Amino acid sequence: MGKPIVAIVGRPNVGKSTLFNKLAGKRIAIVDDMPGVTRDRIYAEAEWLNNNFTIIDTGGIEPENDDIIVAQMRRQAQLAIEMADVVLFIVDGKQGLTDADREVAHMLRKASKSIVLAVNKIDRRQLDDNIYEFYNLGLGDPMPISASQGLGLGDLLDEVIEKFPEGNVEEEEDEYIRIAMIGRPNVGKSSLINKILGEEKHIVSNIPGTTRDAVDSYVETEEGKFVLIDTAGLRRKSKIKEQVERYSAVRTLASIENADVCILMIDATEDIAEQDERIIGYAHEINKAILVIVNKWDLIEKDDKTMKNFKDKLRTKLSFLPYASFLFISAKTGQRVHKVLGMAKECYGNYCKRIKTGILNDIINKAVLMKEPPVMGTRRLKIYYVTQIGTKPPTFVFFVNDPELLHFSYRRYLENKLRESFDFSGTGIKLEFRERKE
């Protein structure tokens, strides 16, 4: 299962963003300049007592206001509530209970979500009595907090994580490889999923934005069991006219976090765009297995060098992904579509790969004999041994005399030796260096 999602909702000016910033701290998890996300600070990672979760800040809900922008903000909040595992409903303890609070409470009850009610702006003990009128909302015990001063947040977070879904609720999904289809609007994500499923399950249209949210499709084939997640395409900031598009972007990012393999779909008839680089860069940063699919290959005039030249151009553009696997398809004609799940499974297998410690040390010892670490000052890096400490992605710890003696070029050399010796195509690998006294 992915990380739980907590939506912070309430009418305007009750302190939602203050609470969001307090919970997020400096742990904003989105790469800079992501469309409508980082700049607006609506999506971040938080942690409490070793429980990691995602928080979403929403625009203020004004139920009776028909202004277009306000209506869009209301729809944003509804989308966030739909996505959430827990809804954190914030009210203003100084202003007291309002009709708008009652309307929001009514909306939340209809959503049938786990709700935690927080009464904000209780900055001193004398104001504690202000919470009691909020029992009238019928949403359980109101919790007094001061987001600006950080008061009561520990008790609040205890209550929030208490309502997280149990980790084994969807245990059967562990058998499934989760694949997120990402890319700009209209590159053929839904068409590819429909081809794989053999049915018109998704709306397929040349109107960008027909996939508003991430949709999961379960499929079992000879290759294995898969969950295919079709996401809304990410656009350039200038094209995000509707406030609702922010939450499509958020949902795409959440889908990447919950995926094992990310498939970036690119239109062969168009150049790779900056937003393609950004979104797959995010998948790379959080260490997902990656497959790049070039769709609409049937529309390209080809000779025997076309595919190689196209792949070389992509490798240059995506230079931070030297390990990515590539596949050229046509979702429309079905060309090479039968290879998609097989290649995704290979990427996933490499993502989960474990190497025995003895074999690992043989490879590294030979690599050191072939090329000694460079001398820094009067000292040379010594590698005592290496062991694998994790998967998804494969993570290796090198125990050395002093990590400060490691030059970036030698780190790259060691990673290349591991990749030459073991197939890690389609996945990043992590190398850590720790000091061990002789």
From Swiss-Prot:
On whether GTP-binding is a keyword of this UniProt record, the answer is: yes
Which residues hold GTP 2? 183-190, 230-234, 295-298
Domain EngA-type G: start-end pairs: 4-168, 177-352
* Family matches, as InterPro entries: AAA+_ATPase, G_ENGA, GTP-bd, GTPase_Der, KH_dom-like, KH_dom-like_a/b, P-loop_NTPase, Small_GTP-bd
Question: Which GO BP terms apply?
Answer: ribosome biogenesis
Read off the CDD domains from this record.
EngA1 (cd01894), EngA2 (cd01895)
Q: Give a single Pfam family match.
A: KH_dom-like
Keywords recorded for this protein, A-Z: GTP-binding, Nucleotide-binding, Repeat, Ribosome biogenesis
* Binding-site positions, GTP 1: 10-17, 57-61, 120-123
KH-like domain mapped to chain residues: 353-437
The GO terms describing molecular function are: ATP hydrolysis activity; GTP binding; ribosome binding
Subunit and interaction comment: Associates with the 50S ribosomal subunit.
Q: Which NCBIfam families match?
A: GTPase_EngA, small_GTP
The entry sums up its family as follows: Belongs to the TRAFAC class TrmE-Era-EngA-EngB-Septin-like GTPase superfamily. EngA (Der) GTPase family.
For this protein, the record's HAMAP family field holds: GTPase_Der
Record's function text: GTPase that plays an essential role in the late steps of ribosome biogenesis.
Name the chain's protein: GTPase Der
Q: Which organism is it from?
A: Clostridium novyi (strain NT)
Q: What is the lineage of its organism?
A: Bacteria, Bacillati, Bacillota, Clostridia, Eubacteriales
Q: What's the encoding gene here?
A: der
